[in-house]
Amino acid sequence: MAHTKKGGSSRNGRDSESKRLGVKKFGGEAVLAGNIIVRQRGTKWHPGANVGLGKDHTIFATVNGSVSFRTKANGRTYVSVNPIAEAAE
């Protein structure tokens, strides 16, 4: 009796959703307080002056200013925000 054999079952076709990690604001860019600068797993970049570190290691600005990245002698890269001088009104 003619019939079609059972089709194969693929064991592929799964992947995790991307987490959109990485640098969101680059060196020299202006940021506002609360802006996310880096999303990361672990501390590839370390917090410097005027930034905070979230519980998921996200680095964010605590003041308005411009972003700067600096590698120190210990080999660690630190992210800081240089505050903008407020104009006196």
Curated annotation (Swiss-Prot):
GO terms for molecular function: structural constituent of ribosome. GO terms for cellular component: cytosolic large ribosomal subunit. Pfam families: Ribosomal_L27. One of its GO terms (biological process) is translation. InterPro entries: Ribosomal_bL27 (IPR001684), Ribosomal_bL27_CS (IPR018261). Belongs to the bacterial ribosomal protein bL27 family. This is Large ribosomal subunit protein bL27. It comes from Brucella melitensis biotype 1 (strain ATCC 23456 / CCUG 17765 / NCTC 10094 / 16M). The lineage of its organism: Bacteria, Pseudomonadati, Pseudomonadota, Alphaproteobacteria, Hyphomicrobiales. The gene is rpmA.
